[in-house]
């Protein structure tokens, strides 16, 4: 058994050594081919470089003009430069200084300030209208009429109404005219009658446990008061 194992191990070692030698030979051949290709490529690049030989640009350093010509050219250029500077200074003095250019941010700030001012002006001019309830309005009217003893009906419409009524009850031959004091006395009497009638009507509505005045309340008040009371 030991001799057989030794034979197997020796066979394996010989096989592995043969494989390693073959791999080394193959790698060496590949390296040689790579070196040959690199050398040929290098030679080709050198050959292409030799096709374009370098030439020194001597014309750049050689001057075709003499010293006298250079000096005259320099003097002419200096004179032209002085004339140009004088002309530029005169032109700058003649031209007006332009206004500074306003940037976009400056214009935007100005627009915002203008809109803000307009909004504040509108708010100051706009009146705040307060909404009152019907009960508040009624209380305001009661206090307003209690403070004054003036007539409640306008004078001109009342005078027009009186003339229309008199024209209906008179003929064309009769020419009735009213004095201003007579119309004022008639207006005071009619307003006193209406105010008294409405007071009694309101009392009847409250007696019926109502706030709203109705037609039947006024009819009952007229019946109680009599025809001319």
Curated annotation (Swiss-Prot):
Pfam families: Histone. Coiled coil: none annotated. GO terms for molecular function: centromeric DNA binding; protein heterodimerization activity; sequence-specific DNA binding; structural constituent of chromatin. Changing residue 176 to S: In CSE4-102; impairs nuclear division by disrupting the core centromere structure. Ubiquitinated. Is degraded through ubiquitin-mediated proteolysis when not protected by its association to the kinetochore. Component of centromeric nucleosomes, where DNA is wrapped around a histone octamer core. The octamer contains two molecules each of H2A, H2B, CSE4/CENPA and H4 assembled in one CSE4-H4 heterotetramer and two H2A-H2B heterodimers. Interacts with the inner kinetochore. Interacts with the central kinetochore protein CTF19. Interacts with YTA7. This is Histone H3-like centromeric protein CSE4. The gene is CSE4.
């Amino acid at each position: 058994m030991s001799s057989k194992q030794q034979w197997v191990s020796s066979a394996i070692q010989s096989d592995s050594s043969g494989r390693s030698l073959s791999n080394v030979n193959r790698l060496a051949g590949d390296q040689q081919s790579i070196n040959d290709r690199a050398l040929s490529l290098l030679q080709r690049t050198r050959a292409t470089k030799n096709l374009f030989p370098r030439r020194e640009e001597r014309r750049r350093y050689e001057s075709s003009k003499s010293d006298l010509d250079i000096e005259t050219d320099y003097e002419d250029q200096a004179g032209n430069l002085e004339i140009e500077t004088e002309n530029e200074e005169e032109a700058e003095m003649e031209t007006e200084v332009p206004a500074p250019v306003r940037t976009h941010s400056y214009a935007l700030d100005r627009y915002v300030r203008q809109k803000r001012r307009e909004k504040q002006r509108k708010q100051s001019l706009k009146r705040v209208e307060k909404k009152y309830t019907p009960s508040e309005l009624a209380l305001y009217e009661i206090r307003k009429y209690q403070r004054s003893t003036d007539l409640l009906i306008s004078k001109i419409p009342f005078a027009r109404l009186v003339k229309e009524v008199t024209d209906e009850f008179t003929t064309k031959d009769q020419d009735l005219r009213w004095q201003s004091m007579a119309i004022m006395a008639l207006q005071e009497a009619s307003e006193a009658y209406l105010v008294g009638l409405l007071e009694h009507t309101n009392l009847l509505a409250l007696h019926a446990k109502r706030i709203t005045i109705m037609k039947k309340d006024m009819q009952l008040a007229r019946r109680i008061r009599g025809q001319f009371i």
